[in-house]
Design a protein with these regions (language model features):
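Nucleotide/phosphate-binding catalytic cleft detector across ATP-hydrolyzing
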Residues: 1-166, 183-198, 210, 218-289
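Ser/Thr-glycine-rich phosphate-binding loops at phosphate-binding pockets of nucleotides
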Residues: 169-175
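Short connector loops/turns at beta-strand edges and beta->alpha or beta->beta junctions
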Residues: 172, 181-184
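Conserved blade-register residue in beta-propeller folds
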Residues: 29, 176-178
Length: 289
């Protein structure tokens, strides 16, 4: 993220680029991460200050978790989350007014089919005036640049000689790309709905069936992210069993796409990398970069 902008009384001089990662688990900018959740209210929230006010409605950010929607342009949710991410990044820079270009991504195999709709969705209003955390922001949106997700994460890996496989496992999708001698292989691109939420849903269903109680994601997420440690309680053991089954399925899918442990360097990014680290033996074998 560039930092050579000049600001004067909270207003940027010249265009600035702001990167946004619209994940189903979290919204990420260069300096902020928050849960992908939004709840709409007609009146100002009583206890929460973490809200967007836009067109006379109030949207509390990050208290809930969006259900996987398939197409992010089907509702206003990701538009409001974009405003929140934009405000977070401007606030970090000490800005309240700016000309902005968004840099955003799409899953690898969906770039061609969804880019036009995604750009139109984010560009639906070029003159933005809204409030976030009770502070006013004014933005002239100059454009939206769309990139294939995942490639930027391995940009600093150097030449990447030999055979490599990039796997981006987010909350909603899993994308795969082969990179041979530093060259991405177009025909190898694939994206499918097999993100971490698939695993989370199975864990919650199993725990509900066993105990008759809905276990919220916030109690399961730390186990998926960090492993179960020394815990032996029911939640931990069910999480371990289902997460191990999920990572086995991931490895099967990678193998079906041509992955060979002794021949191909595996680069895993996204939240799914935590599961492979804690619930498979790939890391112990040194197979994951």
């Amino acid at each position: 993220m560039e930092k050579n902008y000049i600001q004067n009384n909270g207003k940027a001089k010249g265009k600035i680029y702001i990167g946004l990662d619209h994940g189903y688990g979290n919204i990420k900018t260069a300096h902020r991460v928050f849960t992908t959740g939004v709840e709409a209210y007609d009146e100002e929230p009583i206890v929460s200050t973490n809200f967007v006010k836009y067109r006379e409605k109030y949207y509390v950010i990050g208290e809930s978790h969006l259900v996987y929607q398939g197409n992010k342009t089907d509702s206003d949710d990701f538009y409001i989350l974009t405003l929140a991410g934009l405000a977070e990044e401007l606030k970090f820079r000490g800005l309240h007014e700016a000309e902005v270009v968004f840099a955003v991504g799409l899953p690898l195999a969906w770039v061609k089919s969804q880019a036009a709709d995604w750009r139109a969705y984010l560009m639906q209003e070029k003159e933005l005036s809204f409030m976030f955390q009770k502070e006013r922001y004014k933005v002239h949106l100059c454009g939206v640049e769309i990139f294939p997700q995942g490639l930027a994460a391995v940009h600093n890996q150097g030449a990447m000689p030999g055979m490599n496989m990039l796997v981006d496992i987010g909350n909603g999708t899993m994308s795969i790309l082969e990179i041979n001698d530093g060259r991405p292989i177009e025909k190898s691109i694939s994206t499918e709905v097999f993100g971490v939420h698939h695993c989370m849903e199975k864990i919650q269903k199993e725990l509900s069936k066993r105990g008759g109680v809905e276990v919220p994601e916030m109690l399961i997420e730390p186990l998926l992210r960090n492993g179960i440690g020394e815990r032996t309680d029911d939640v931990a053991m069910v999480t371990k069993r289902i997460a191990e089954s999920y990572t086995e399925e991931i490895i099967k899918k990678l193998t079906a796409r041509g992955y060979k442990e002794d021949l191909i360097h595996l680069y895993v990014i996204g939240g799914g990398g935590c599961l492979l680290r804690h619930f498979s033996d790939l890391t112990e074998k040194g197979a994951v970069k």
